[in-house]
Amino acid sequence: MQEIENLHQSVLLQEVLQAFTPLEEGVLIDCTLGLGGHSKALLSQKPHLKLIGIDKDKFAQEIAKERLKAFEGRYNLLSGGFAKRFKEALETHNKEIKGVLVDLGVSSLQLDDDDRGFNFHSHALDMRMDLKSDLNAQKVINSYPVIALEKIFRDYGEIKEYKKIAHKIAERRTKKPFKDAKDLSEFLSSFSKNKKIHPATLVFQAVRIEVNSELEELKEFLQCARNLKGAILCVISFHSLEDGLVKNAFKDYAKNCICDPLSFKCACSNNHALGEILTKKPITPSPEEIKNNRRSRSAKMRVFKFKP
């Protein structure tokens, strides 16, 4: 277990604890439990807090369960997509929920596991968070029509040369289908000129988002979260697409006026804000954290406090 503690470092851990300082009791929902690092720290710090942990990765959940053993009776772990499970928990525990945490990152355990296909050297081409899901990265790369590849590279990877990359992949797979992540990564590196990041980074991001329906799930969650009352919502994102959705949702939550933007005069009484944004700018990792954990460098945390 100590090996897991050393392997996976929870991103922005102290900042998360700070965000939930007002919480003393009630229920906190960790929508993306992962290996349970944030949850363990929160349960340790707050003896009267109860936890609902959600994750679609069964293997990660087993590890989290072992790490949370000391808090038996104070937590309940649920399997599945966090948007659906959060909605169910909200319907059952609405008044008790005092905090909600969403960490949208991929864990180090998943990234480093060569059987999962998340890293550039993996001997699998999978990328599924839920191993029961039918769609995997191999199906996307080897079977999607060129126009579909173009769309996900453009929309989910924000890749400038999305057409070129999609066509090159399609051309190569007709001769020899891609067998694993290493094969795909080396192929992308053979013609990409991107010197700032690894040539495969944005393609892998786009495919992972597609395989796991990540943005759709986040949108569904943010819509459902509007129904929270008196709770603190903390979301950690890792790329601009996620952060943009969270930023805009929080702005929408905080709007007092819900009149048509084209209206000349407010007719809604101008008091419809669901709460307030507690982070005018996103919280980012300290230089020290980035030095100790390079994978934290793109993390951004936003916090919203809902009215009772």
UniProtKB/Swiss-Prot annotation:
| EC id | 2.1.1.199
A Pfam family cross-referenced in the UniProt record is Methyltransf_5
Instruction: Report residues binding S-adenosyl-L-methionine.
Output: G36, G37, H38, D55, F86, D103, Q110
Listed GO biological process terms: rRNA base methylation
**What are the transmembrane regions?**
none
Q: What is its main location?
A: cytoplasm
Q: Please list the reactions this protein catalyses.
A: cytidine(1402) in 16S rRNA + S-adenosyl-L-methionine = N(4)-methylcytidine(1402) in 16S rRNA + S-adenosyl-L-homocysteine + H(+)
Gene Ontology molecular function terms on file: rRNA (cytosine-N4-)-methyltransferase activity
What are the protein's UniProt keywords?
Cytoplasm, Methyltransferase, rRNA processing, S-adenosyl-L-methionine, Transferase
Q: Which family does it belong to?
A: Belongs to the methyltransferase superfamily. RsmH family.
| Protein name listed in UniProt | Ribosomal RNA small subunit methyltransferase H
